Amino acid sequence: MKHSALKLGASLLLALGLSTQAMAEEYNFDIKGQHAFIHFKIKHLGYSWLMGEFRTFDGTFSYDEAHPENNKVSVSIDAASLDSNHAERDKHLRSGDFFDVENFPTASFSSTSFKSTGKDKGILHGTLSLHGVSKAIDIEISQIGTGPDPWGGYRRGFEGHTTLHLSDYNMKKSAMLGPLAENVELFLSVEGVRQ
């Protein structure tokens, strides 16, 4: 009788553990539908904003509403897809003076932890690998919305922003754009489709 009770207790604990794990939802970025964006802006000589985006990237995220500390994000970016709406400038930004996409074709971000700062928002801690350098960064995240889509799927959307320092990634030529070009504001908007 005691053995049966122990066995039943172990089964219940296992079931509870599995149900807790099942609460985490896995999402893929909606790249095909173009409902994901990575934009940036940087000051040009301190007189105006130079704006652009990375047009080719992919990513996934795991969302656990009950245990937000388990939330995870992974993103891979094609550095050569940088687009600032000016062909000659983009060629220069892709060159060895800046992103050097021939030697460093991919940038990536992988989260290490998440801290909730209120309902539907928090700080995503992780590592950004760019231009051959990996640095810890924090991204402020807010959930935009969630719910079913017209095609039988389920979606969840977030936006986030952070500030990068080009010298942290050995882009010393950033001084060519003026001292205020050291800081790059990065903004992302992501809609994920639940798997």
Regions found by a protein language model. Name each.
Residues 1-10:
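Bacterial N-terminal signal peptides that target proteins for export
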Residues 4, 17-22:
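Hydrophobic membrane-targeting alpha-helices
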Residues 9-19:
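Bacterial N-terminal signal peptides
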Residues 22-195:
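Low-complexity, acidic/polar, glycine-enriched regions of mature
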